[in-house]
Regions:
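Residues in the short beta-alpha loop(s) of Rossmann-like NAD(P)-binding domains
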Residues: 99-103, 179, 259
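Helix-to-beta-strand junctions that scaffold the AdoMet/dcAdoMet cofactor pocket
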Residues: 167-169
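C-terminal hydrophobic helical "lid"/dimerization subdomain
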Residues: 51, 115, 132-138, 145, ...
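Adenosine-nucleotide cofactor-binding segment
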Residues: 64-65, 71, 82-159
Length: 307
């Protein structure tokens, strides 16, 4: 609801279904990222495993202290999944993140460091799978028994195929990335389904409870969604930016619908600008680790020209 609108009308269903949620976060832009975070939270919540061997009673969520593989997780949703795996209520012992573009992997490694993961009891490994012939064999070096939870972040048949092979006993594969092709399919090993209790989950967005959990995670700064806010812009540049969105690098673009401002990378403000407020904005961003922040947003709203 909202999009590029400057004002909106809530439908009666929103109120009747209890879907108007209270948000007391530090900034508007973090609130705008509740929905994408809820998709990740929902995916993690949808995972399930046996309570004990041969039990038909399931424990919902990722396997605590287990091994997780996030395949193709070098986009904004993958970044949120890394953050949530490290800082969420249930943590794995081992977290392997893959991608095929080294630049994106390097960005992930800067934002979500091995050291930060270690502080939270998680062994974090980044792997570029571009030139790896047998991905299953290579990634099992980090979890010999296989992976308890595997998340697929790209609708790629090959990735699904080796992702299925990576599952441990009672392993759960989540097909997170929605395909455009209605006939998208991949080979499935039914031997492992029968004898090793492997299973599959597909989630498409989060529900109201996932949204509530996401709000709490953002308000408490447990998950730092600012790490995926790479650009800001005003409403005057929203149309053109939307048209070329697939061609743009970076993650989420934050539109301030009452402001006039060109599409700008958060860490690329010009310190030599003639506008004093641009120079001050750069200073604020640098103080916050080159990330957009509540402080930067408040200064921007106060000083950027109105549409």
């Amino acid at each position: 609801m909202g999009g590029d609108a400057t004002t909106i009308i809530f439908s009666d269903q929103v109120m009747e279904n209890g879907s108007l949620l209270k948000y007391n976060g530090d900034s508007f832009f973090e609130g705008s990222l509740v929905e994408p975070l809820s998709c990740v939270v929902g995916a993690f919540n949808a995972q399930y495993h046996m309570k004990k061997m041969y039990s038909y009673e399931h424990v919902m969520g990722i396997k605590e202290g287990g091994a997780i593989a996030l395949l193709g997780a070098t986009g904004p949703m993958g970044f949120l999944a890394i953050d949530f795996a490290i800082h969420g209520p249930k943590k794995p012992k081992t977290l392997v993140v893959t991608g095929r573009t080294q630049k994106k992997i390097d960005m992930a490694a800067r934002l979500y460091t091995v050291e930060e993961a270690k502080k939270n009891g998680v062994k974090l490994v980044y792997v570029n799978t571009r030139d790896i012939v047998d991905v299953n064999k290579e990634l099992r070096k980090y979890s010999e028994k296989g992976f308890d939870d595997v998340f697929i972040f790209a609708p790629n048949e090959e990735m699904v195929t080796y992702g299925v092979k990576m599952l441990a006993f009672d392993g759960c594969l989540n097909f997170f990335s929605g395909p455009a092709d209605q006939e998208f399919s991949s080979r499935v090993n039914f031997y492992n389904i029968h004898y090793n209790s492997t299973h599959f989950v597909g989630t498409s967005g989060g529900n109201t409870e996932d949204m509530k959990q996401s709000i709490e995670l953002i308000e408490s700064k447990t998950v730092n969604v600012a790490k995926i806010a790479t650009h800001i812009l005003g409403l005057d540049h929203a149309v053109e930016t939307t048209k070329v969105l697939p061609e743009l690098e970076g993650s989420k673009k934050i539109v301030y619908t009452h402001k006039k401002f060109p599409l700008t990378e958060v860490d690329k403000f010009d310190e030599n600008s003639d506008d004093k407020y641009i120079r001050e904005l750069k200073s604020i961003v640098e103080r916050n680790g080159n990330l957009w922040s509540g402080e930067a947003e408040r200064y921007f709203i106060q000083n950027a020209p109105e549409i």
